[in-house]
């Protein structure tokens, strides 16, 4: 699974650092456990209802994106949804994709800390 999905959800810097760990000759591919969380996520994510009343959110919301996410990143959709959230802050991490904590942990942590500091008690 990781050999197929990783290039779609990780950014170039992470892929370059981890390239030697993928597509190895001795890799054994086994079916996913149907009781696992990742199996449930992958098999049901297409049925999720994302049509939520974002306009009614009263708390501050942080939207952190990585433009190299080849599955979920759609700039138009991000702009449309962000425009519907009253108290939104957006941050795009330019070298990242979907797996922000794994790809750029320190930078992602700084974004979260800055957001937390911006909140009024």
Language-model segments: what does each one mean?
Residues 1-55:
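Conserved alpha/beta-hydrolase catalytic His-Asp/Glu region
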Residues 33, 72, 76, 103:
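Residue-level signal for the nucleotide or nucleotide-sugar donor/cofactor binding architecture
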Residues 57, 63-65:
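Short beta-strand/loop motif that positions the catalytic acidic residue
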Residues 58-59, 87:
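Active-site acidic short loop of glycosyltransferases
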Residues 59, 73-82:
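Short alpha-helix in the alpha/beta-hydrolase fold that links the catalytic acid
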Residues 68-72, 98:
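Acidic catalytic loop of the alpha/beta-hydrolase fold
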Residues 87-121:
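Catalytic active-site module of serine/aspartate enzymes centered on a nucleophile-bearing elbow/loop
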């Amino acid at each position: 699974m990781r050999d197929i999905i990783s290039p779609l959800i990780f950014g170039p810097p992470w892929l370059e650092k981890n390239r030697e760990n993928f597509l190895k000759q001795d890799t054994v591919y086994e079916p996913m456990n149907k009781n696992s969380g990742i199996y449930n996520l992958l098999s049901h994510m297409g049925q999720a209802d994302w049509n939520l009343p974002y306009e009614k959110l009263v708390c501050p919301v942080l939207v952190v994106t990585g433009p190299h996410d080849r599955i979920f990143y759609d700039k138009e959709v991000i702009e449309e949804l962000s425009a519907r959230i009253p108290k939104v802050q957006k941050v795009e991490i330019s070298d990242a994709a979907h797996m922000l904590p794994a790809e750029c942990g320190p930078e992602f942590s700084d974004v979260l800390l800055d957001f937390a500091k911006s909140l009024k008690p």
